């Protein structure tokens, strides 16, 4: 079974549509987001607040982590850091302990104004030079750095989770029925 966090959102639900034996971790809310999943066959739908308990004694083939507060105008720093950094860190810890491949979706918001360019250089030094312009970009940037620092400190980590790890950076501008400016990605080793 695969777990897709953020699987009820626009991009996540389209990914889920292409997968089999998948569980979704997301807040459905009251704005009709459930409709994105209504035509899908799902193994489960789990609220993020219940994920830790759900993961107990569970074996997953992989985790695709897309869940985040993605509004670039978000202002609640505590909520954004809890959701985008701390929750992500706990999920990465679980994947590490259970040798589960972890695919993480970052954001092009980590580039900031682009004074360092928009080319994916997965080195820690290159990431440390990036200056995100908003809280959302900064929260994703912190997690990008955490992953790369763990990989640098513990080379066996990549083998333990069945690598290669993949870092995807999506641009935040979306339109109904499609992305108008795509994504960039780089394998992280």
Walk through the language-model features, giving the residues of each.
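SDR active-site strand-loop-helix element
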Residues: 5, 25, 63-67, 102-108, ...
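Conserved sequence/active-site signature of Rossmann-fold short-chain dehydrogenase/reductase
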Residues: 30, 110-111, 166-169
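Glycine/proline-rich active-site loop of Rossmann-fold NAD(P)-dependent oxidoreductases
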Residues: 141, 154-155, 166-182, 189
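N-terminal Rossmann/SDR dinucleotide-binding element
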Residues: 1-62
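Rossmann-fold NAD(P)-dependent oxidoreductase module
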Residues: 14, 18, 94, 146
